[in-house]
Amino acid sequence: MRLILLGTPGVGKGTQALELSECLHILHISTGELLRVEMENKTPIGMKIDKYMNAGELVPDTIIIDMLEKRLQEPDSRKGFVLDGFPRNLNQADYLKSSLERLQTPLDRVINIEVPIDTVLNRLLQRNRADDTPETIKYRLEIYKQETIPLIDYYQRAGILEQINGDASPEEVTNRILACIG
């Protein structure tokens, strides 16, 4: 099973990705975690990433694409995966489609988790990440509207999009996702 989780920052994509990877025995690939590891290790790429994330900006596609390409080529990703935090725009979606076609591992489903904006704001402010200040949250939500919302139409046209109400307990959201992917 190869899945993508979409939704605004704070809808619980990371939580759901972990649950789904355990339930389905597939790999959880978090681009956010890949980025944070680079920053924590203070690699040259990590220092570039740090500047973008602390400003609340999206990391350039070229950086994300290079990191993900390497990860998808590792043997454990062939069993299946759930992508958390990628793609975030149409360019990345096109890249991912091409990459998965080359690897002969097409996507099975894209899950869009929907949560009311007030709930999202509360969740983001409570998770105590350095990059979750009110200013960066507002900016990231605006970027999401501009860059990521078009992905919903993209995957709807591809016939693999499922919409999930994420305004529930994590367990209930997991059950809803599992029910829709069969």
Where are each of the predicted segments found?
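Glycine-rich phosphate-binding loop of ATP-dependent small-molecule kinases
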Residues: 1-182
